[in-house]
A protein has these predicted regions:
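A short, polar/proline- and glycine-enriched secondary-structure boundary/capping micro-motif
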Residues: 167-170, 243-248, 277, 302-308
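Active-site-adjacent helix-turn-beta-strand microarchitecture at beta-sheet edges
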Residues: 191-270
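Short glycine-rich loop/turn motifs
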Residues: 141-145, 220-221, 278-282, 354
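Conserved, well-ordered active-site substructure
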Residues: 198-214, 268-322, 327, 333-361
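Beta-strand-turn-beta hairpins that frame and shape the catalytic cleft
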Residues: 141, 153, 230-231, 285-292
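Extracellular/periplasmic catalytic domains that process cell-envelope and extracellular macromolecules
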Residues: 139, 177-179, 216-218, 227, ...
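Zymogen propeptides
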Residues: 2-215
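Short, solvent-exposed aromatic-acidic interface loops
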Residues: 160-166, 239-243, 296-300
Length: 361
């Protein structure tokens, strides 16, 4: 067997170094003879192609195009704004025309009913109410007609009793008008004397409740008042639910009903002759919900002066009234406007009564 010669580590390293030395020399020579890369110091290499003037021309062209686009945009906005203003003006004109046309039937109707009353001798007008006072004198009686347009339902209210608030307390129409700050007032429902005072007759609705409870109509008694929507309501009611359905704001009771749905009602015989003629207060409404109040003069309650209910019934129908109700009359009949008593009370002075219808500016 042939023995392998032992080689020391140091001897192996020298041998390896001698073997690669030629290659190291070659690489060193190549590095020395190769020129290193240089950075160019010429700025022209970094200037974009084309001259500065050409570049400026391109930029100017872009700016000009942007200016044209801006002008076109501004012009478009101005045209749109002009069209909007024209459209708004046109719509406004159409609305005014529509409102004018819508109001024409009301104006025509108002002129028609006013023509039957004549020329007003006094007028009150505000954003809540319009009142026109007329004289009436058909020959057999004379008095006043007051036409009322409620622009706001709250412009009409009812007063009950006096400032004392005691049951059965009373006051004159003038006192009620003054105490509540009203511009006008009339007497309202009937009353019954007893227990040291004058108490409202039958069903009376005030301040959201029935004063003495609901009482079904009897002996031709009729309720009359105003609904919360500002419409005159009234008639004979035999159940509370029927009256509640009309949503009353206030109301009082007297007798009789004179007109219903534009037709004359049958006047009870007693009320045709007891008394025959008398000072009267009646209230009615037109189909546009304007109110008409008639207050006739009379020097006493003996039946020789004043108006009959039949005469007033006919007068109201000719005037175009739809529904009408007789209120308390005789010495109770009263009409106050602008701080003065318009009619001449048959008692010689105003009679204190429990209820009044009041009107506010």
């Amino acid at each position: 067997v042939r023995k392998l010669k032992y080689i020391r580590p140091k001897q192996l390293n020298r041998t390896f170094m001698l073997a690669i030395a030629p290659f190291i020399g070659m690489l060193l020579c190549m590095w020395l003879i190769t020129e290193p890369p240089r950075l160019s110091h010429e700025t022209a290499e970094y200037i974009p192609s084309g001259s500065i003037s050409e570049q400026s021309a391109v930029i100017k062209q872009d700016l000009d195009q942007a200016a044209v686009s801006a002008e076109q945009t501004i012009s478009s906005i101005e045209k749109t704004a002009k069209l909007y203003r024209q459209t708004t003006a046109t719509v406004g004109t159409i609305l005014q025309t529509a409102e004018s046309q819508a109001a024409r039937p009301e104006q025509i109707y108002n002129r028609r009913i006013t023509a039957k009353l004549g020329v007003p001798i006094e007028t009150v007008n505000s954003d809540r109410i319009r009142i026109e006072l007329y004289k009436i004198n058909p020959g057999t009686y004379h008095g006043y007609a007051m036409k009322v347009k409620l622009k706001d339902p709250s412009a009409m209210k009812m007063s009950l009793g006096s400032e004392s608030g005691r049951p059965g307390s009373v006051e004159t129409t003038m006192r009620a008008v003054s105490r509540h700050g009203a511009v006008a007032g009339i007497n309202a429902g009937g009353y019954a004397d007893g227990n040291g005072g004058r108490h409202p007759l039958s069903t009376t609705f005030y301040d959201g409740k029935y004063v003495s409870g609901f009482q079904p109509s009897f002996k031709d008694l009729a309720f009359v008042g105003l609904s919360k929507s500002g419409k005159l309501i009234g008639g004979k009611f035999y159940s509370q639910s029927d009256l509640d359905r009309l949503d009353p704001m206030f109301g009082a009771t007297f007798v009789p009903v004179l007109l219903q749905n534009g037709r004359k009602t049958t006047i009870p015989d007693k009320w045709k002759t007891t008394p025959g003629r008398a000072p009267r207060t009646v209230i009615g409404n037109y189909k546009d919900d304007q109110l008409l109040i008639l207050v006739t003069e009379g020097y006493d309650e003996k039946g020789k002066s004043g108006a009959t209910l039949q005469e007033l019934q006919t007068k109201l129908k000719k005037m175009g009234v739809i529904d009408a109700y007789n209120l308390d009359g005789g010495g109770s009949a009263s009409l106050v406007l602008n701080g003065r008593v318009v009619n001449k009370p048959s008692d010689g002075s105003l009679r204190p009564v429990p209820t009044h219808f009041l009107f506010f500016k």
